Amino acid sequence: MSNLPWLTIIVILPISAGLLIPLFPHKGNKMIRWYTLGICLLDLLLMTYIFRYHYHFDNSLIQLEEDYNWINLIHFHWKLGIDGFSIGLILLTGFVTTLATLAAWPVTRNPRLLHFLMLAMYSGQLGLFASRDILLFFLMWELELIPVYLLLSMWGGKRRLYSATKFLLYTAGGSIFILMGALSMGLYGSHGPTFDFELLAKKDYPITLEILLYLGFLIAYAIKLPIFPLHTWLPDTHGEAHYSTCMLLAGVLLKMGGYGLIRINMELLPHAHSLFSPWLIIIGAVQIIYAALTSMGQRNLKRRIAYSSISHMGFVIIGIGSMTYTGLNGAILQMISHGLIGAALFFLVGTSYDRIRTLFLDEMGGIAIPIPKIFTMFSSFSMASLALPGMSGFVAEFMIFLGVITNHKYSSTFRIIITAIAAIGMILTPIYLLSMLRRMFYGYKVLNVPNPYFKDSGPRELFILICLFLPIIGIGLYPDLVLFLYNAKVEAIFSQSFY
């Protein structure tokens, strides 16, 4: 059993199963939903089994490696492997995608294509987190682009084509930099082309080339993460997408940018990373404040949550730039934490819209009494988003603060200023979140909404929300539940020379 190509199986299974969907009878919409949900759940259980019985968590090396020669002419290999950093994001992908599939249950328009696209996106994201070849990394980066574009353009709001096109142009533009960087790294040197991560890490690049490569990759990841000022596609995309797609975007897609920033920029280009790290911290601090202030001015509920996501990603950037063991641990934990919280908030926004048929805060008010379950869950996840102690966001943000403060590479003045700016962002977060809750659920406007007659959450919706809430509480109370996955990997990253 240990010799099976486990990683190839979990990467290929979703998209292969999706190709069978056209064979289902035309009136088998319910069957397609159950089939897709079953495939997602099977893949999640399979990866849980693999990591439980075939992975050694105290080992920082790449494990479960698979290497198959794919295109010999250009030395392109199907090479997969995982370490502690990959595992957390792969499990997050499986968990959020399974719940997003369940969230898409009410969609009745063209369900065959919808569920195939979700499965194709699932494979692309798993493949990216498991890639050990930089060309394969690029291929998987591109694979999820088309499913997301179609999900946005076919199941969205009135401006869905505009937002989908904007997403496509931004992401495709960033992908060019990944391809150029991958080819430059692979072809550099006198030993022939190689795109293997391990071999690329051993190459010694001239500092000028390393800086140029770092900048190119940074632009691509800045679009996906996103990093200010390349973030403008995100509010438009979230504002128009169906909430099941929003769950995948907030829960998984944004984390691809953070993953690339650590996996390629930090691991393969360490000297350039040490030069850029102060600038990452400054940009992250500015982003926290900017996005929080912008969120406060949003009338549209989805756009307010979208800017909240941008603000929270600022902490990830600071943690990556902190150049400390604690800060990087906090950044990875923040990625996982936000994946759960962001997915839950967008699901709640979508279920609220299904009932009251409006996304504008000034048209809401007084809906806490008719839908107390949604009110309770919305309040709970908002508390998680503002990093209430006892929840996952608090631990992650505290570790990031600690990482910045304890890095003596930076002057004490710089550390104090950055900490103060980020702390202001933490003060602004409850302001825009609590204001959102007040305008939605309190007051006397309930009869003014387009649909004043609606029901509270059903069993399916409560199940999704509870599944997302339990790990948030679990990580908040016992962070080692997640930290043990990648502690050894983070130690290995800092064992290399950055200077």
Curated annotation (Swiss-Prot):
Keywords: Chloroplast, Membrane, NAD, NADP, Plastid, Plastoquinone, Quinone, Thylakoid, Translocase, Transmembrane, Transmembrane helix. Coiled coil: none annotated. Pfam families: Proton_antipo_M. It catalyses: a plastoquinone + NADH + (n+1) H(+)(in) = a plastoquinol + NAD(+) + n H(+)(out); a plastoquinone + NADPH + (n+1) H(+)(in) = a plastoquinol + NADP(+) + n H(+)(out). Its EC number is 7.1.1.-. InterPro entries: NADH_Q_OxRdtase_chain4, NADH_Q_OxRdtase_chainM/4, NADH_UbQ_OxRdtase, ND/Mrp_TM. It is a multi-pass membrane protein. Its main location: plastid. One of its GO terms (cellular component) is chloroplast thylakoid membrane. It comes from the Eukaryota. One of its GO terms (biological process) is electron transport coupled proton transport. The chain crosses the membrane at residues 4-24, 31-51, 87-107, 113-130, 134-154, 167-187, 211-231, 242-262, 274-294, 305-325, 330-350, 386-406, 416-436, 462-482. It is found in: Plastid, Chloroplast thylakoid membrane. GO terms for molecular function: NADH dehydrogenase (ubiquinone) activity; ubiquinone binding. Belongs to the complex I subunit 4 family. This is NAD(P)H-quinone oxidoreductase chain 4, chloroplastic. It comes from Cryptomeria japonica.
